[in-house]
Amino acid sequence: VKLSKRWSTSLLAHYENETKAHDSNDDGFADIPRVEQYNLWNRWAYMGDRYVFQAGIKVLTEDRNSGQVSHGKTSLADPYKISIGTDRYEAFTKNAYIFNKEKNTNLALILSGSLHKQDALYGRKIYDVDQHNAYASLLFETELTKRQSLSAGLSFNYDSYDQHYRLDNDAAQPLTKKFTKEAVPGAYVQYTYNWDDKLVLMGGIRGDHSSEYGYFVTPRFHVKYNPNEYVHFRLSAGKGYRTNHVLAENNYLLASS
């Protein structure tokens, strides 16, 4: 919705309710999960002559259930159930100031944060997690010549995971508690050469420091060559790092035996 010459906003909402169990093959297990989900997304934008601003929030609430189902009036004494409850909240803001429109010289600041809470039950196995994330990025871009451009930036990423879990079916076993956190500040610089969109060369390097793993450097190089509008060649080289969170990323495997 355009509120004025410079301000606009949008609001999206979604509701899903699939709460009836289906067992078409009569194997005693639900064919698809029963899901009730709420989604809300709101964004605001300001477009000035030199200043650009965006901000938004996202909210997700979901209950997902599956497992054994009973047919008719017969009830199961101890059915196998899967239950996953999720609450997620996100917020972001993007700010950019244009110093020189002809050379596309600008400075941008991006901030975002999220809270993710999940309570999952797989039979007697349990995996509950609270994740907090904060991210900040400061970027500078400019065109050196008609065919050359340079970008550089600083970034900071923070993650924390508060996990409570039981990985076997013994309900008498206490929950294991594990808390991890990682802070990663970093910086990068990137050079781009563009010859009439036929040949594009891009080279960059960034350095980061992880509070868990120390310093590391990640270079990268990209080449794109377009001899005509139908043929395109691409070549990329580089390396990257990421921190694995095995249970958070693969807890769905707890549903298997």
List the predicted regions and their residue ranges.
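Proline-centered turn/helix-capping motifs that create local helix->coil transitions or kinks
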Residues: 61-65, 158-162, 242-243
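Surface-exposed loop/interface segments of Gram-negative outer-membrane beta-barrel transport/assembly proteins
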Residues: 97-110, 169-170, 177-178, 248, ...
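Hydrophobic, lipid-facing positions within transmembrane beta-strands of outer-membrane proteins
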Residues: 1, 36-42, 87-93, 132-138, ...
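Outer-membrane beta-barrel strand-turn architecture
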Residues: 2-7, 46-50, 97-103, 142-146, ...
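Flexible loop and strand-edge segments within Gram-negative outer membrane beta-barrel domains
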Residues: 18-39, 47-107, 113-131
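Surface-exposed loop/turn segments flanking beta-strands in extracellular/periplasmic regions
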Residues: 68-80, 164-165, 169-175, 252-257
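Surface-exposed extracellular loop regions of Gram-negative outer-membrane beta-barrel proteins
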Residues: 6-25, 37, 102-121, 149-159, 167, 211-217, 225, 229-257, ...
